[in-house]
Amino acid sequence: MAFRAICVLVGVFICSICVRGSSQPQARVYLTFDELRETKTSEYFSLSHQQLDYRILLMDEDQDRIYVGSKDHILSLNINNISQEPLSVFWPASTIKVEECKMAGKDPTHGCGNFVRVIQTFNRTHLYVCGSGAFSPVCTYLNRGRRSEDQVFMIDSKCESGKGRCSFNPNVNTVSVMINEELFSGMYIDFMGTDAAIFRSLTKRNAVRTDQHNSKWLSEPMFVDAHVIPDGTDPNDAKVYFFFKERLTDNNRSTKQIHSMIARICPNDTGGQRSLVNKWTTFLKARLVCSVTDEDGPETHFDELEDVFLLETDNPRTTLVYGIFTTSSSVFKGSAVCVYHLSDIQTVFNGPFAHKEGPNHQLISYQGRIPYPRPGTCPGGAFTPNMRTTKDFPDDVVTFIRNHPLMYNSIYPIHRRPLIVRIGTDYKYTKIAVDRVNAADGRYHVLFLGTDRGTVQKVVVLPTNSSASGELILEELEVFKNHVPITTMKISSKKQQLYVSSNEGVSQVSLHRCHIYGTACADCCLARDPYCAWDGHSCSRFYPTGKRRSRRQDVRHGNPLTQCRGFNLKAYRNAAEIVQYGVRNNSTFLECAPKSPQASIKWLLQKDKDRRKEVKLNERIIATSQGLLIRSVQDSDQGLYHCIATENSFKQTIAKINFKVLDSEMVAVVTDKWSPWTWAGSVRALPFHPKDILGAFSHSEMQLINQYCKDTRQQQQLGEEPQKMRGDYGKLKALINSRKSRNRRNQLPES
């Protein structure tokens, strides 16, 4: 029974190894929430044990504050240490609104509260904040003081309606930007959640919105993000870009499919004079594509945009747009990261317009005359210096925009394929942040990818020989105790910190923790983390301005042979030899766990002084990610096993195991609970002398016996009663006699 139980446990262990050892790339280092806290590179904040739906809505590096919205609370956290006592404002929905919300059948816990969804900088002293208000949106001004030292954080004005500024439903995302004390929002404007709009409010000018109930403009959108992006050198040509996904009817007009989109408008758009009054006259949109083309032709689309990050440069046209996409298919679960050049996006918006033609309303490129100024052009910009407002636009320009808001060409990622693809994993990506890092051998982009399981993956983008780029997962961190989806993520390159939120709270994580890779130069070099380098003593933070000659870093190739000469590399590559015993016809496991799952493992066997030969794998001998399983040990398995790990052409011996095979009968007798070995204090009861027993076994077998005796002595020291003399000596006596005769045959003459 004991042997059967062991077999079952080994089987479960192997199954778990097989599940973990999928074809998907794995992180070099995985840290649980508690392990991450032990590194002292993270902080955590939560108001209570309740789920309050935290959202990081604004980061102010000048005042060293992080502004967080949650259910009934507005929080101001210290950007250097979020676990310090926060400044907070309790801002619940009115009792009447909460009761009305419940009467309407809304969720009392996750709907009938004031979920803060908008926090924008209004001026030097005030923030503008909006909440769902128990399905009755409300906004107000919050005084934060001129300096962070003022410790001022309070609402000092009356609340006003948030309609057109914040969605009624807290589970429907609201996106916003503030420009010159004007709020641009993407949200749903009604209680029922049927009227979506991109809205300009909080303005001394007239309020402007998208054309109402016009599916050509917006069709059941789910807003993701919004950004102000320059377009040329003239500030009047800047655009507000809205990223969203929407349900569009296919050509058969029978089903709706989800597509990711980008829309843009001019901030100085005041609407049309006779048509599109108080509606955008510069609204255009284009489809955002993230797909993988199979070898046989068809495309697998990642249709649902989840998050966007803009990696800005000194030249706005070279800005990169990173997007997280997921599949809308119910067949498989997948995520992808696609990267776009801003210049490619702007080229599509300057390209042909889409036009529906024919009985099937097929989309084609519009071939008619394009009115002047080109639809989508901002008034007062480089191309329209004489037009002060959009009310000066000719009627044909406004009419064209109303009927042709969609661009014909779609926006494709760099190299027309995703940078990262994950299919068949137990997680999906939800959020992204990107940092640009200067290393010894170049500049690298490091991606921080939040998942729906409460982890953050740190991924470095590596150049390859082809036109595409490779990627390597450096770390995966559990930033929350429970596996809850990550809702927002902000990065501060200045502070070298990442800020992450979920339903449960907010976490702060350093962008690097170099010491976790290991204590040797080779470990540090193989990690290929652009934040880290070997300084001659440890793996530590790399500073490009440093002039220390002992700094060792090779992100591009990760080759310790060229970087770690003189740092005890030879000793590092050899492992100490250990002895392990196995029992004939039983199972055994030779453990060999490489420091990195990115290393490949090969087993070599050396018998006596013969050359090492690679272990042949079969149904009896199985290699796993954690070691070598021998399902039925044979005498031929005895020898010295070498576990060789290879990573980036660098080989090292992870384990040396001198494996010795024991006789099953001897082990059964020695380990039997009724064995005479348990009667160490009752020698007189034995029908033969103990020396006869000791002489019956080989040196290696005696090592096992000595260990058994040691365990017995420890039991006696703990005060346990010695077991009574019982058992059958016949089997033991026969074994002793056979061993005696064998030992006499093999005994060397005394010298």
Curated annotation (Swiss-Prot):
GO terms for cellular component: collagen-containing extracellular matrix; extracellular space. Residues 1-20 form the signal peptide. SUPFAM superfamilies: Immunoglobulin, Plexin repeat, Sema domain. Disulfide bonds join C101-C112, C130-C139, C266-C378, C290-C338, C514-C532, C643-C709. InterPro entries: Ig-like_dom, Ig-like_dom_sf, Ig-like_fold, Ig_I-set, Ig_sub, Ig_sub2, PSI, Semap_dom. Disruption phenotype: Perinatal lethality. Mice display severe defects in cardiovascular development, including aortic arch malformations and septation defects in the cardiac outflow tract. One of its GO terms (biological process) is heart development. Residues 571-655 form the Ig-like C2-type domain. Keywords: Developmental protein, Differentiation, Disulfide bond, Glycoprotein, Immunoglobulin domain, Neurogenesis, Secreted, Signal. GO terms for molecular function: semaphorin receptor binding. CDD domains: Ig_Sema3, Sema_3C. Glycans are attached at N81, N123, N252, N268, N465, N585, N586. It is found in: Secreted. Residues 28-511 form the Sema domain. Binds to plexin family members and plays an important role in the regulation of developmental processes. Required for normal cardiovascular development during embryogenesis. Functions as attractant for growing axons, and thereby plays an important role in axon growth and axon guidance. Belongs to the semaphorin family. Interacts with PLXND1. This is Semaphorin-3C. It comes from Mus musculus.
